[in-house]
Regions:
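Post-HEXXH active-site segment of zinc metalloproteases
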Residues: 165-189, 223
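Zn2+-dependent metallopeptidase catalytic core
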Residues: 90-109
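Catalytic Zn2+-binding segment of zinc metalloproteases
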Residues: 141, 145-150, 158-175
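Post-HExxH zinc-binding segment in Zn-dependent metallohydrolases
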Residues: 178-211
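Envelope-exposed proteins and targeting segments
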Residues: 94, 113-115, 131-135, 147-152
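Bacterial Sec-dependent N-terminal signal peptides
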Residues: 1-33
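C-terminal capping/extension segments of zinc metalloprotease domains
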Residues: 27-77, 81, 88, 108-111, ...
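Catalytic zinc-binding patch centered on the HExxH motif and its immediate surroundings
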Residues: 118-133
Length: 461
């Protein structure tokens, strides 16, 4: 009877979990509220802010006491800076999910208490490992992955770096090289060793995935994703940004130089790309020698749960690139998400807000300051969009931005975010006299609003 009751309770729990997952997707279809750090700060988070890190390694390179202390202090300083700056999430669904996948990999090992997984706000498609057992996964990576097994490979790769003491070895060999004078081969040797560490971590990661019953063949796809060799569907910015105030025409568009051409023409170092290429070929070769097991899975946790977490990471990418003033990238990420969530209010409003700031920079003739990805763009659609923005005249930019913002305001006339964007845009494109009614509406509707004092001050001028 007890067993039947337990099974019944478990089935209810699973049903609730499934319902919550669907409910979250329904919410994402309509709107999104960026993650805010709240609640009690976890002890593992505070530990890194306080600098209470314990590095575990065998001193195979025989560093002296001063060098070991420098390694500890350096690790402590960088981690404290990353965590204090608010770059790491806590009490959030992404971190919980990543840790569950990590637990699957560490189950039955002696490492469960040594490694702690965190998720960062960084948009780079990457993850990092520290010798104290800290593993940080960027939202930029989570947003691009296609399934749980790929995330498992990324985590297993970082776990392998910790197991093999690669952070310590990199530091130790760097210190030893500082003692060698006039060594012209230092950089080449260091690059070769770094590649060897990556190849070693890839190989060990396959064993970890195999043991945890994950489909290790997904590993080579992760390297493809890191190289940005994957399809990304984004809605047409030509159609989306056009309005009755400004219609984007063929004459406004341009075809910028491709990233690959830039690499060849400007002699930019391609060592990182070459390294990934070697890793991918070696990994595919390694996988071809492993006997495939039918029982291996792309998902151990629920597939819907991964999709939900990936979507959250993509929404966070829109928000974080905006907060870092990377307005062009934020719009591009929003355009990509609009394929899956065409009626999401947050996305439409965030594009409006990004455009407002782009126009502000353009009016001041300093628009070049927001082209963070200039000459580093691998995605053709994104490159086309950046080139289009750069080519617009000031007058055309004003028309396009005002037309789009006005269109979104008509769709969401009482939304606090949209109302203040409309007020600021009208003031920027025309003057305060035209914007006055929008500020008055904001002050009337949102007494406790985020922009209430600013709006009130505008009206008092």
């Amino acid at each position: 009877m007890k067993v039947i009751k337990t099974i019944y309770q478990l089935s209810i729990f699973v049903a609730i979990l499934f319902f919550c997952s669907n409910l979250t997707f329904a919410q994402l279809a309509e709107d999104y509220h960026p993650i805010k750090l709240k609640g009690e700060i976890p002890s593992d988070f505070l530990k890194r802010i306080k600098g209470d890190v314990q590095l575990k390694y065998e001193n195979s390179l025989r560093l002296n006491s001063v060098q070991k202390e420098q390694f500890r202090v350096g690790t402590e300083y960088i981690l404290r800076d990353i965590f204090q700056q608010g770059n790491i999430y806590f009490n959030d669904p992404m971190t919980d999910y990543v840790r569950k996948v990590g637990d699957n990999l560490l189950y039955g090992t002696d490492l469960a208490n040594d490694i702690t997984f965190f998720v960062s706000r960084f948009n780079v498609t990457n993850a990092t490992t520290w010798q104290d057992g800290t593993v940080i996964v960027n939202i930029g990576l989570i947003a691009c992955l296609e399934n749980e097994a790929q995330l498992a490979f990324a985590l297993a790769h970082e776990i392998s770096h910790y197991i093999q003491q690669h952070p310590y070895l990199q530091y130790g060999r760097f210190v030893k090289k500082q003692q060698v004078e006039n060594n012209s081969n230092v950089f080449v040797q260091n690059t070769d060793r770094t590649l060897n560490y990556e190849l070693e971590a890839d190989s060990i990661a396959i064993n970890l995935l195999k043991k945890a019953k994950y489909n290790y063949n997904e590993g080579s796809k992760v390297l493809r994703i890191v190289r940005r060799e994957y399809e990304r569907d984004a809605i047409s910015f030509v159609r989306y940004l056009s309005s009755d105030k400004f219609e984007i025409k063929e004459i406004n568009l341009c075809k910028p130089i491709s990233y690959q051409d830039y690499m060849e023409n400007e002699s930019v170092s391609s060592k990182s790309i070459l390294s990934l290429d070697i890793r991918q070929r070696k990994l595919i070769k390694r996988l071809s020698r492993v006997e495939y097991q039918v029982s291996l899975k792309n998902y151990i946790l629920a597939k819907d749960l991964f999709k939900k977490i990936q979507s959250i990471a993509r929404f966070e990418l829109v928000e974080q690139t905006f907060l870092s003033s990377n307005y062009l990238r934020s719009i591009y990420e929003a355009l990509s998400l609009l394929n899956d969530f065409p009626k999401n209010k947050y996305l439409h409003i965030k594009v409006s807000e990004n455009l407002y700031y782009i126009n502000s920079y353009n009016d001041l003739s300093i628009i070049d300051r927001i082209f963070f990805d200039q000459k580093k763009i691998e995605d053709e659609v994104y490159a086309d969009f950046c080139c289009f923005i750069n080519k617009l005249t000031k007058e055309d930019m004003r028309k396009m931005v005002f037309g789009f913002v006005q269109q979104q305001y008509q769709n969401y006339p009482s939304d606090e975010r949209m109302l203040i964007i409309m007020a600021k845009t009208v003031e920027m494109v025309y003057d305060m006299e035209y914007a006055k009614s929008y500020y008055e509406k904001y002050v009337k509707l949102y007494v406790d609003g985020e922009h209430f004092l600013m709006a009130k001050k505008k009206l008092e001028q």
